[in-house]
Regions:
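Flexible loop/turn segments at secondary-structure boundaries
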Residues: 50-53, 82-85, 118-120, 153-156, ...
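Glycine-rich beta-alpha loop elements in corrinoid/cobalamin-binding modules
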Residues: 79-225
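Low-complexity, highly charged intrinsically disordered N-terminal segments
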Residues: 42, 46-47, 53-88, 92, ...
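Iron-sulfur (Fe-S) cluster-binding segments and ferredoxin-like electron-carrier domains
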Residues: 276-292
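N-terminal [4Fe-4S]-dependent radical SAM core
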Residues: 13-43, 50-51, 207, 214-262
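N-terminal pre-triad scaffold of radical SAM enzymes
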Residues: 44-48, 66, 250-277, 301, ...
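Conserved SAM/AdoMet-binding glycine-rich loop
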Residues: 44-45, 298-406, 411-443
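Helix-enriched interaction subdomains in cytosolic or periplasmic regions
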Residues: 1-19
Length: 443
């Protein structure tokens, strides 16, 4: 099915499904290139619904990096909601890209973001919807190469039968290495020949060149190389310096989970919380200079129309220049009614000076991440914060003019009891009580 036929069928399907804006494309700042003028065509598949996937920073970064190159194109695809999936299957319409409405089968590479393991089943469902064989050994040179990346692919073996390659580490540089190599492939080249060329790229794990070995109890033991030329060890790719951030991200037509402009200010973390995978694999810490952040905001705001900027990192209050940065934003964007969002702050790193700096901006809520509601459990996960520290911090936040505090908790920590779970509600009520005592019914 070509994209002309696909568009005709979509004209019949979309009026019948919930939130058709998930499936139309055409958003502000979307990039559409001439299909015939391109050397390598990539679909960026985020195996979640559009509402969630469009808020993923990694997708935004790769879309920007690939499309800056004149000979490559990147288009987006997401898994549909159940009504749209049913309609696609009934009409035999393959999963397609939003920009050009080409079936995913038409692309050279299917680049899949897998930030967490719960997306594995969505990923396989997306392959099936795209009419791409699920198992890699059932695919031919006529199918796109399926390359996955993201935090959950640091252990790629659970999905190894379904992929051609996995990126281990950060993707900004390796994606261009992959595309440059692919651009040198000859027409009709077999998949195995393509993978033989790609295996020379550092940070790329290609399962076909290895055989997993398991212990008697079924646990994983090691990998045995099936070809001598395969790397003995896959070295994690690390970007030494953060590349320029996207300053013209796509603005969705519909509500997404984060309706704001994203701007990464720091990558990595030194805290070492025992539950946190991202805090380990994204080391070392790299900070974006204040001047670069301010210059990006100068274009990001008019390019998107957003009035809220998310200063993103694993813990933005640990950014060493956070107070000078917020003060500089206050000064440069005074009178523009710009809100600053600092997601998921560590309680012990929230200072009075930071709250003083933030208090001059339009408030969008304050988010703290105790992660566990009892001191015993917080000590176990290496977040040694007392209940009193949390309550004192909450009081300071309320006193500085915030009415809403969001608390992040997780259920399922090792040694957790029902008392620990009940403490989530109890501690939340104590924080609310502090708010009522401090600012009254506005809390």
């Amino acid at each position: 099915m070509d994209n002309t036929q696909l568009n005709k069928k979509l004209g019949k399907i979309l009026p019948k499904v919930e939130m058709p804006g998930r499936y139309t494309g055409g958003e502000f700042n979307q990039i559409v290139k001439n299909w015939e003028d391109i050397d390598v065509r990539v679909t960026l598949l985020f195996p979640e619904i559009y509402d969630l996937g469009m808020s993923n920073l990694g997708l935004t970064i790769l879309y920007d990096i690939i499309n800056r190159e004149p000979n490559y194109l990147a288009e987006r695809s997401f898994v549909p909601w159940v009504d749209m999936e049913t309609a696609l299957r009934e009409e035999n319409v393959p999963l397609y890209s939003l920009e050009s409405k080409h079936p995913l089968l038409d692309f050279d590479i299917l680049a899949v973001s897998l930030p967490y393991e719960s997306l594995y089943t969505n990923f396989l469902n997306a392959l099936d919807l795209a009419h791409i064989p699920i198992h890699s050994n059932d695919r031919t040179e006529d199918h796109p190469l399926v390359i996955v990346g993201g935090h959950s692919t640091f252990n790629p073996e659970p999905i190894a039968p379904f992929i051609d390659a996995a990126v281990i580490g950060e993707g900004e540089e390796i994606i261009l290495d992959i595309l440059e190599t692919y651009a040198g492939f000859q027409p009709g080249m077999s998949t195995i020949d393509k993978l033989n060329r790609l295996k020379k790229i550092e940070g790329l794990y290609i399962p076909i060149f290895y055989e997993p070995v398991y212990n008697e109890d079924g646990t994983f033991s090691n990998l045995e190389k099936m070809v001598p030329e395969a790397p003995n060890q896959i070295i994690k790719r690390i970007v030494g310096k953060l590349p320029p951030p996207p300053n013209k991200p796509i603005v969705p037509y519909i509500d997404t989970v984060h309706n704001r402009a994203p701007l990464e200010i720091m990558r990595g973390c030194t805290r070492g919380c025992r539950f946190c995978h991202a805090g380990i694999v994204t080391r070392p810490v790299r900070e974006r200079p204040v001047d670069e952040i301010l210059e990006t905001m100068e274009t990001l705001i008019p390019n998107t129309g957003y009035s809220e900027i998310g200063l993103l990192s694993l813990s933005s209050s640990d950014y060493t220049q956070i107070v000078p940065l917020v003060e500089a934003i206050n000064e440069r964007f005074e009178g523009q009614n710009i809100a600053i969002s600092l997601p998921s702050l560590r309680i012990e790193s929230v200072s009075v000076s930071l709250m003083d700096a933030l208090s001059g901006k339009r408030r969008s809520g304050f988010t703290l991440a105790p992660e566990a509601a009892t001191e015993r459990l917080r000590n176990i996960i290496n977040k040694p914060i007392s209940d009193q520290q949390l309550l004192d911090t909450a009081k300071e936040i309320y006193q500085h003019g915030w009415h809403t505090i969001k608390l992040y908790f997780m259920i399922g920590h090792p040694t957790e009891t029902l008392d620990d779970v009940q403490a989530i509600a109890d501690l939340s009520k104590r924080v609310l009580k502090v708010g009522l005592q401090t600012i009254g019914s506005r809390a």
